[in-house]
Amino acid sequence: MYPPQKTRLSPEEEGQPRLLSIGQSAGGMRLGGAPWLTLILATVLVGIHGAARAAGPVGLDTLLRWGAKAGPLVVDAGQVWRLVTAHFLHRDFPHLALNVLVLLAAGSGLERLCRRRDYAALLVAAGLATMAGSLGSSGGVSVGASGLVYACVGALLVLGRRHRAKLPARWMSSEAAVPTVLVFLWMGWTSVGVDNAGHLGGLLAGLLAGVFLEPRWHPDTGWLRPVGMVVAAVVVTGGVVAERSVWRMERDDGFGLSVALPRDWRGDVDGQGRRAFSNGLPGRGRATFSAEAIEAGEPGDGSVQARQFQQEVLVQGAPSPEGRTLKVTEPVAARVGGRSAQRLHAELEGPGGPTHLMALFVPRGEWVYRLVFTWPAAYPAYREVVDRMVAEVRFDEPSVLREARARALLVPGAPGPLRALGGVLRRLGLPKEAVAPLSESVRLAPAHVETRVELARAFLEASRVEEGCHAAAEARVYGPWDTGALEAGVRCELSRGNVERALERLVEARRVDPQDARLRAAELALRTVLEAAPHR
């Protein structure tokens, strides 16, 4: 009944002492006025859930759009406000109903027992503590006012224990609520999809606040207590956010590639077998990164692979692994990790809505590294995350090169390990470094044609054309019918700018191995170049 008929509590109140649950305790309170703050909060919770349902089914994308806590959006996109808005959202009606009922019971009792500003500060501090626990444990999506409810229960438990001498047993007895709290926690830990860390954070905040909260009949200490609670919660939450904001360096030893990633991004292999990472969110909030090494066979600038990706994967209007392509730009020159690269952008309609895509093609000798980033258009702050990832790409020494160096050192004077080391260096775009071990291998095994071919290619790719042509000629002497030696002669003539002579050499190589598809394609390409050239 409101207003309350009695405002005074004493141990001598009528009735025998008896243990009551928290739900029963609310109705018998006689402190303070109507619990307006609790009633307003409950009304807001119901109203927001009703508005969300009126807008459509309350799925994951809807919750994200309305402000659910999602670790990647809080940490990566800087949307810290989600740590507040998540409390006002609920998955479904049973979730909402349970929270509102317990909030009306425990929250009303606490609001009438304590000063309203202390109660409001408890709600704010508990909300932050709940999200700190949730974020510290998992970056997943979380919603609900359960943490506030646990905080109210925890504060009532401690207050009931501290002031049991002045509070009649029929009005409040902390031991009565302990089994209920334990049952709720047990249900949470044994259920799927329950934010137990958030619940525990709220409960601990309430228990701690209960140590400092005082009933209305105690002297008023002003704003010191409520401000202190909120400041402490802000500091703790800020520490958790800062700790989750630390990036990590992900290194692929096989590729010799290092990329900085937000701490909570998860590694996986996508449907195309590529090394991939994502922020762990499905649908609307999903951001991804994938890397793949493409064996090009020839050194280049990555433009061939960029256009192939544009024409085969990002076909306008056609579906792709990342979504339906709406718009794609032409490849442009870029720099990644100190290397020249090709970059293109695309706009897609992904599973969660409009999505941006950026693909980078970074040549490394006979390989091209394809780095693909996608991020949701709904969260433009993710562009800064992608830019940072690109800026911190580093190219390290791949494991295959380290192993080749180690073998060459372990067996000094052996031509095989030196030949292998030189070949790896050349294929990784280090022809100048490849010359020395290949030259030594040729000296140790002069009749080995493959080594001479590798040496010729290393000279030519290092822009030492005449030395490369000399090495190609010597390879032809030791292997007159070896297609590799003949092909080295083709490369020599191309380096000299003599396309016609290169075609003659290529025809010779084709006679030796007419079934070689690579030589056939090269001959076709050279004939096309000659036909397109102006006649003199």
What are these regions (language model features)?
Residues 267-370, 375-379, 404-405:
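Conserved polar/disulfide-associated segments of primarily extracytoplasmic proteins
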Residues 415-416, 449-450, 483-484, 517-518:
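Helix-start (N-cap) detector for alpha-helical repeat units in TPR-like alpha-solenoids
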Residues 2-248:
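A detector for small-residue-rich transmembrane helices and their helix-helix packing motifs
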Residues 263-266, 367-410:
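Surface-exposed amphipathic alpha-helical segments
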Residues 427, 461-462, 495, 525-532:
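Register position in tetratricopeptide repeats
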